[in-house]
């Protein structure tokens, strides 16, 4: 049954009943009968407000009905997600532009955060946190400070122990509750995190943290999990979680603009690809002690935020001519995994046509007596004075009758199927081979005869 529409006359009836005590004592039918005579005497101008009110009521009812079905809810959710994304991008752009306009872009401070979790609810975005790390970073100073802690939530979602065990064993390898490590008081932990973020960004400022786009939902859920037991959370600061990859893109564009460099080739796809390469993934000494001992440094949150800081340094500090400091901009111990060879080193040895990295003297193993950094002249001298002579192993001699040296291609018939004629043919062909390739036939005394030997024996 279609819903009834609001009319201008009924709007007038309802208003008359609300304003007159006599109308409030009447039934709806009596009020309609009484107001009908009054409505007939009213002109178009007097009826106008009531007719307009009836149309507005119909529109409001239709909008309410559409929002109650599935399509209305989906559209609303998509609208909210789009607005949230645009608001996040505008906020990131404003943060970077404000630092640029104040000529302090290299000193702008950003906080990177990462969470590990035990399990996720099947039907909702509820994550049970297991580990947290935050890093304060600026282009000029690199890593300013790191906050890292493990989390013991006390229990995991009922019925998801197997999922939690599988996720833990394939990622961070942290023990599950009730044997979990770290802080057990969620309220205390959340306040410590808020205090750290406030110290990094200043009191009274909005708490903004950055994490990869695919982790934003998980990080927001973990923050909600930690603050749910805090009785004073309504009056506290709200933590905003933004996309670190979009920050990298905007910051790179502005850095190149400040350095007066061409940024036409810089786009979101290029910066995302650079970030996801994770060049410092296997760097030692940047994870917590637990993950260092268990060889799970890749999944350690402390290692994650540190690697992101190194990635920002690697991508932008060179554009601003910022001197990098080991342990802050790059790993404290960096071992080069390459060897520089002069482009014309092979031309110094004219007798060799097979020069390569492995054929050059001393390229494979570094002698202890030689210094690490050698000059170009010393490198040329060592190559020229070497007695190394490359050998050409591409030519060799072999017996054509040896099956092991020349394996048959396909189904080669065995010699036992050829008979006497085939054997004789092979012996004849062997006589045409070079001397050093002929078969050595075993001989006996009967194969040799001496002239006159038989006659002497007879006598």
Swiss-Prot record:
MF GO annotations: sequence-specific DNA binding; transcription cis-regulatory region binding
Q: Which organism is it from?
A: Drosophila melanogaster (Fruit fly)
* UniProt record similarity statement: Belongs to the maelstrom family.
* DNA-binding region, residue range(s): 2-69
What cellular component terms from Gene Ontology apply here?
cytoplasm; nucleus; P granule; perinuclear region of cytoplasm
Q: Magnesium as a keyword?
A: no
Outcome recorded upon mutating residue 131 to A: Reduces nuclear aCCumulation in ovary and ovarian somatic cells. Affects transposable element silencing. Causes female sterility
Q: In which tissues is it expressed?
A: In germaria and egg chambers, it is detected in the germline. In the germarium, it is in all regions, including region I where the germ cells are dividing. In early egg chambers, it is uniformly distributed throughout the nurse cells and oocyte but, by stage 5, it is most concentrated around the outer margins of the cells, closest to the periphery of the egg chamber. Level decreases in stages 5 and 6, but most noticeably in the oocyte, where protein level remains. No detectable protein from stage 8 onward (at protein level).
- Briefly state the protein's biological role: Involved both in the piRNA and miRNA metabolic processes. As a component of the meiotic nuage, plays a central role during oogenesis by repressing transposable elements and preventing their mobilization, which is essential for the germline integrity. Repression of transposable elements is mediated via the piRNA metabolic process, which mediates the repression of transposable elements during meiosis by forming complexes composed of piRNAs and Piwi proteins and governs the repression of transposons.
Region listing for Disordered, in residue ranges: 43-78
What residue spans carry the Basic and acidic residues bias annotation? Answer: 63-78
* An example Gene Ontology biological process: spermatogenesis
What Pfam family is a match for this entry? Maelstrom
Its name, as the record gives it, is Protein maelstrom
Give the disruption phenotype, in one or two sentences: Female sterility and defects in karyosome formation and oocyte polarity due to transposable element derepression. Ovary shows mislocalization of 2 proteins involved in the microRNA and/or RNAi pathways, Dicer and AGO2. In testis, transit-amplifying cysts fail to differentiate into primary spermatocytes, instead breaking down into ectopic germline stem cells (GSC) and smaller cysts, due to a depletion of Bag-of-marbles (Bam) protein.
- UniProt keyword Cell membrane present: no
Where does the protein end up? Answer: Cytoplasm; Nucleus; Cytoplasm, Perinuclear region; Cytoplasm, Cytoplasmic ribonucleoprotein granule
Question: What keywords would UniProt list here?
Answer: Cytoplasm, Developmental protein, Differentiation, DNA-binding, Meiosis, Nucleus, Oogenesis, Repressor, RNA-mediated gene silencing, Transcription, Transcription regulation
Q: What is the lineage of its organism?
A: Eukaryota, Metazoa, Ecdysozoa, Arthropoda, Hexapoda
């Amino acid at each position: 049954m279609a819903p009834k529409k609001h009319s201008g006359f009924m709007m007038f009836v309802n208003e008359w009943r609300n304003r007159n005590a006599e109308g409030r004592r009447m039934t709806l039918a009596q009020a309609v009968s009484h107001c009908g005579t009054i409505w007939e005497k009213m002109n178009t101008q007097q009826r106008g407000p009531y007719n307009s009110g009836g149309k507005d009521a119909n529109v409001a009812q239709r909008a309410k009905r559409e929002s109650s079905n599935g399509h209305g809810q989906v559209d609303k959710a998509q609208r909210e997600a789009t607005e949230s994304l645009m608001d996040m991008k505008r906020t990131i752009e404003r943060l970077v532009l404000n630092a640029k306009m104040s000529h302090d872009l290299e000193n702008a401070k950003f906080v990177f955060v990462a969470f590990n979790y035990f399990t996720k609810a099947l039907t909702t975005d509820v994550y049970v946190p297991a580990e947290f790390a935050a890093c304060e970073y600026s282009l000029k100073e690199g890593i300013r400070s790191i906050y890292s802690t493990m989390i013991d939530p006390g229990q995991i979602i009922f019925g998801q122990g197997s999922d939690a065990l599988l996720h833990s064993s394939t990622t961070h390898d942290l023990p599950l509750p009730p044997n979990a490590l770290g802080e057990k008081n969620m309220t205390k932990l959340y306040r410590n995190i808020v205090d750290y973020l406030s110290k990094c960004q200043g009191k009274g400022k909005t708490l903004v943290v950055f994490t990869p786009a695919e982790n934003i939902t998980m990080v927001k859920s973990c923050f909600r999990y930690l603050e749910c037991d805090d009785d004073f959370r309504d009056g506290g600061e709200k933590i905003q979680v933004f996309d670190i990859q979009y920050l990298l893109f905007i910051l790179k564009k502005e850095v190149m603009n400040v350095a007066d460099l061409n940024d036409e080739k810089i786009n979101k796809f290029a910066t995302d690809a650079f970030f996801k390469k994770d060049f410092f993934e296997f760097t030692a000494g940047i994870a917590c002690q637990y993950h260092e001992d268990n060889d799970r440094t890749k999944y350690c949150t402390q290692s994650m935020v540190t690697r992101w800081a190194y990635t920002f340094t690697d991508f932008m500090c060179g554009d601003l001519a910022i001197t990098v400091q080991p342990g802050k901009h790059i790993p404290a111990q960096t071992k080069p995994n390459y060897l520089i060879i002069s482009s014309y080193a092979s031309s110094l040895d004219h007798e060799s046509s097979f020069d390569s990295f492995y054929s050059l003297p001393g390229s494979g193993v570094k002698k202890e007596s030689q210094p690490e950094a050698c000059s170009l002249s010393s490198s040329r001298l060592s190559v020229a004075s070497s007695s190394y002579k490359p050998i050409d192993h591409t030519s060799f001699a072999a017996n054509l009758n040896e099956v092991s040296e020349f394996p048959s291609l396909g189904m080669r018939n065995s010699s036992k199927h050829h008979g006497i004629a085939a054997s004789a043919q092979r012996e004849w062909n062997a006589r045409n081979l070079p001397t050093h390739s002929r078969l050595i036939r075993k001989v006996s005394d009967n194969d040799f005869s001496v002239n006159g030997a038989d006659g002497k024996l007879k006598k």
